[in-house]
A protein has these predicted regions:
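Conserved two-metal-ion catalytic palm core of "right-hand" nucleic acid polymerases
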Residues: 1-93, 97-116, 120, 473
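Short, glycine/acidic-rich hinge or "gate" loops at secondary-structure transitions
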Residues: 10-16, 88-97, 141-154, 189-195
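Right-hand nucleic-acid polymerase module
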Residues: 50, 58, 62, 97, ...
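Glycine- and acidic
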Residues: 54-57, 108-120, 155-163, 231-235, ...
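Amphipathic alpha-helical scaffolding segments
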Residues: 74-86, 130-131, 177-181, 196, ...
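Active-site palm subdomain of RNA-directed nucleic acid polymerases
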Residues: 88, 123-158, 162-173, 323-335
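Helical (often loop-to-helix) elements that flank the catalytic cores of nucleotide-handling enzymes
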Residues: 164-188
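Conserved catalytic core of two-metal-ion nucleotidyltransferases
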Residues: 182-217
Length: 498
């Protein structure tokens, strides 16, 4: 979708995906290497998992209850200050104490819990969790259990997988982990405690999901099949597509494994996207006179997506449509454009009931492809926008509203009134630290707002640009202010593309 927007983003993605598993990159947005396994599923499908299932007789799975929320930032001082009960008594000023300060500063000075989401939180959590791992290994060795011989323990973030020869060993390992974790205020989730004899299958839903995924994949030719053909054919095979049967089987799967619904939806959308994305290697998706079949696939994708319309799944679905646009020319072909609009409107309930933050990229897509929603749907979205109080959502929706000049003027009036209100709410002291400042950095370069509103936004920023550089904080404020006051359409928010 962003290929037309920024070549640099695409180039970066292509280079990064050569180093990192592309599926992991698309699913998590993780632009780094995770070693040794990219995900739990890659671990449970590995040779190491199989070997442990053959070598050991007992298996157990436990996890830390509300792991990130339970991590006490002062625990990082305790990691290196032995016998320190009150963290204020910690005197060793090193990395662990700095971590404590940083974590509190990004969490409103609270020492309870790590912010869930940022990869920084996961990295910092590993410092503490690996400290516990080392203690457990040493304590078990002192009790006569040797890692790799008597047992194997694997941890993926807060999930712990235990293999041992006897149930007694398993119980001892769990007790040892529990004692070590309690020192840092971490507890087990008693509702997710699993014991079993090997070989063990953790994801019973996965086999059935793979079977359905394979059925979907049979609708397409594999690249190797096309490569070996004398007469080149499109990726999508000719013949009847039993969409209703696939939908029914999908519902049965979701109903059987309701707790895995998000993963099942992700699996099926990835299957469709992976097959459709083979187009990038120079293959056609459809025969020239059978492009109508595209809407059968899109309807299937929208149906699956409607069960879990999260941000990740939104990106996958939009990507499918953009791949198809090369052959269907939604913006130029009047019939295909109308079919796309009808398809989107048929699933209006997704946008009416979904989380706005998960749906925000749809608004930019709708603008690019001239897709107006139903008026009833827009009324619901407008109400949600007011409740969310999110400048990014307002910016995206303002872009969407441009499909009709009168509607755009209406939304713009609301936005300008909101901006003026936010400016008036910002105090003169430390505007950067105030929530309303997000509206300033989002809309300061907006090409649609009036001159008076733009001047009001700049009035918040200019004092920072002219303040004396008496300390590091003022220098940083000046850099930010000079960046925001540039006469450019693409700053914090890239208005120049729209």
């Amino acid at each position: 979708f962003y290929r037309r927007k920024s070549k640099k983003i695409v180039d970066y993605f292509e280079k990064t995906s050569q180093k990192v598993d592309r599926a992991i990159l698309q699913q998590t947005g993780a632009y780094f290497k995770i070693y040794k396994f990219n995900s739990v599923s890659s671990f449970t499908n590995s040779r190491l998992w199989q070997q442990c299932n053959f070598k050991y007789h007992n298996f157990a799975k436990i996890d830390y209850k509300s792991c990130f929320d339970s991590i006490y930032t002062h625990a990082y001082k305790w990691c290196i200050e032995k016998d320190t009960v009150d963290s204020k008594e910690a005197s060793n000023a090193n990395l662990h104490i700095v971590i404590d300060r940083v974590l509190q500063n990004i969490n409103c000075r609270s020492s309870n819990g790590l912010i869930v989401g940022p990869e920084f939180s996961r990295m910092i959590a590993e410092v503490l969790l690996q400290k516990i791992d080392v203690e457990v290994k040493q304590n078990l060795a002192a009790q006569g259990l040797n890692a790799g011989t008597d047992y194997r323990v694997f941890r993926y973030v807060d999930d712990i997988y235990i293999f041992s020869h006897t149930q007694a060993h398993t119980d001892l390992i769990i007790k040892t982990i529990e004692i070590a974790a309690q020192k840092y205020l971490l507890k087990f989730n008693e509702f997710k405690y699993l014991k079993a004899n090997t070989p063990v299958v953790l994801s019973s839903w996965l086999g059935k999901a793979r079977a359905l995924s394979d059925r979907i994949s049979t609708l397409f030719y594999r690249k190797q099949e096309l490569h070996d053909m004398v007469d080149k054919k499109p990726l999508l095979k000719s013949g009847y597509i039993s969409v209703d049967r696939i939908k029914d089987d999908f519902i049965y799967l979701v109903n059987e494994f309701p707790k895995e619904q998000r993963y099942i939806v992700s699996f099926m959308l990835s299957t469709l996207l992976n097959n459709i994305s083979n187009k990038k290697d120079g293959y056609a998706l459809f025969e020239p006179d059978k492009c109508a079949r595209a809407f059968v696939l899109l309807d299937l994708a929208m149906y699956i997506y409607s069960f879990c319309p999260c941000f990740e799944h939104t990106q996958k679905l939009i990507s499918m449509i953009v791949y198809m646009d090369d052959e269907l020319h939604f913006s130029k072909d009047e019939l295909n454009h109308k079919k796309l609009i009808n398809l989107i409107r048929r699933y209006s309930f997704v946008f009416e009931k979904g989380n706005m933050n998960d749906l925000c990229n749809w608004f930019v897509f709708f603008h690019d492809y001239s897709v107006p929603l139903l008026r009833n749907t827009e009324a619901i979205l407008e109400k949600k926008l007011r409740e969310e109080d999110n400048p990014i959502l307002w910016a995206n929706y303002l872009i969407y509203s441009r499909y009709h000049s009168d509607y755009h003027k209406e939304i713009l009036i609301w936005v300008e009134e909101l901006l003026q209100y936010k400016v008036n709410q910002i105090g003169s002291k430390d505007p950067l630290l105030q929530k309303e400042f997000w509206y300033v950095i989002t809309f300061i370069n907006c090409p649609y707002i009036s001159g008076s509103v733009k001047t009001a936004l700049e009035g918040i920023v200019r004092p920072m640009a002219t303040a004396a550089e008496t300390n590091l904080a003022n220098k940083i404020k000046k850099i930010i202010a000079e960046f925001l006051l540039q006469n450019k359409s693409n700053l914090f928010f890239c208005w120049g593309y729209y």
